[in-house]
Each structure stands twice: as C-alpha cells, then as structure tokens.
UniProtKB/Swiss-Prot annotation:
PANTHER family: BETA-CRYSTALLIN A3, BETA/GAMMA CRYSTALLIN. GO terms for biological process: lens development in camera-type eye; visual perception. This is Beta-crystallin A3-2. Residues 118-123 are annotated as: Connecting peptide. The keyword Plastid does not apply. It comes from Aquarana catesbeiana. Residues 31-70, 71-117, 124-165, 166-214 form the Beta/gamma crystallin 'Greek key' domain.
Length: 215
C-alpha cells in the first residue's frame, strides 16, 4: 500500500553514507529492509541493504515499524548491535510487538540492525552440548524444535553450541518465547562456548526451544 506523500519522507542511502553508518564489513547479498519512525509504516522511512549501527545517525529517534523485503536480519534493542536481539525474517512488522513476538519482556526500542549472512533454512545444522566448552551430552539438530525437553533433551539448559551450517534462533522458553539468541555459522567460527557469547543480553544457560532462521 502506497504511503501518502504528505506523511512520508523517504531518503535513499548512498554508499558513502552507509560507510559512515556501518562499521561492519558485509558482503553484497540479497538483503533489503525498510524502516519507519512511526507505527503501521507511517512517517519517515529509509531503505537499507546493509547494516546500521545507530539509527539515530539517520535522523530517527527509534524504529516503530519495518518491512523485510529480502534476506533475514537481526534487530537490536540498543545501538552498536547491543541489547536484546530480534530475528527479522521476510514480512511486515507494523509494531514493536510483531518482532518481539511472544517475548515476555516489553521492549519497544529497535536502534540497530544487520543482515544474517549465513541463514540457510534448507541446510542448517546445530550441535548442542550439556555443559560449557562443548563438554557432556550432545545432540545434533537439523529441524525446528518448539520444545527441547519434548524431543528428549531432558533439562531446560544448554551449556554450549556449535553452528555447523546456517543460522539459528534459540529461545528462553518452549514455544519460541522469551529472550531470543541468534547463532550464526560465520560468527565466533560457529562456536559458542558459553552463554555469555550468545549476546550482550544473555544472563542464563536457559534455552528451551530452537528453530532455523528463514532466508
């Protein structure tokens, strides 16, 4: 649906401006996201094909709605890719609760984002370990699991993980609820030895559901 011109201010991102905004070297790929400073795709909008470490440098005080047109992305609560993580797959997100999903935490901020370069839904493989540093009982995952306990994991914690292919999103609670942790095969060499490596917001080993990220 076309946004009325009186309500929309569109700005194209030049390569020079993106070089200032984006501190991460990201290879060219099929990624495109459009962000808006008002809910329901209203207000100022801006298109990106690469990462943005601080949306305030683009004249936004926050992102209140967005559309993912190509690829998969990670949104972050704070600037510089910090705080809670939100997986953003292809589709429309008219309000903050559309990307936070059934997260039990009320977080309306989304201040930085980047593409998930390794997402490959058809060829994804993850190995989870009972204890940190890849010790103890292990299990190889190649599918989506709304409940690790139901598939026989036996407890509500995961000590460490190795992403062998693709990208995954892990959730604190069953049914894809709670904090989100995005794990990628091209970050940390695909190895996450301790919960502290899952993200700056991670505080616990608790993971009870896991799924592949859709490209």
């Amino acid at each position: 649906m076309e946004i009325p011109a009186i309500q929309t201010e569109r700005e194209d991102i030049t390569s020079e401006k993106m070089a200032q905004i984006n501190p991460l070297p990201v290879p060219l790929g099929p990624w495109k996201i459009t962000v808006y400073d008002q809910e329901n795709f209203q207000g100022k909008r801006m298109e990106f094909t690469s990462s943005c470490a601080n949306i305030m440098e683009c004249g936004f005080d926050n992102i209140r709605s967005l559309k993912v047109e190509c690829g998969a992305w990670i949104g972050y609560e704070h600037t510089s890719f910090c705080g809670q993580q939100f997986v953003l797959e292809r589709g429309e997100y008219p309000r903050w609760d559309a990307w936070s999903g059934s997260n039990a935490y009320h977080i309306e901020r989304l201040m930085s984002f980047r593409p998930i370069c390794s997402a490959n839904h058809e060829e994804s493989k993850l190995v989870i370990f009972e204890k940190e540093n890849f010790i103890g009982r292990q299990r190889e995952l190649c599918d989506d699991y709304p409940s690790l306990q139901a598939m026989g994991w036996g407890n509500n914690e995961v000590g460490s993980m190795k992403v062998q292919c693709g990208a995954w999103v892990c959730y604190q609670y069953p049914g894809y609820r709670g904090y989100q942790y995005i794990l990628e095969s091209d970050h940390h060499g695909g190895e996450y030895k301790h919960w502290r490596e899952w993200g700056s917001h991670a505080q616990t080993f608790q993971i009870q559901s896991i799924r592949r990220i859709q490209q």
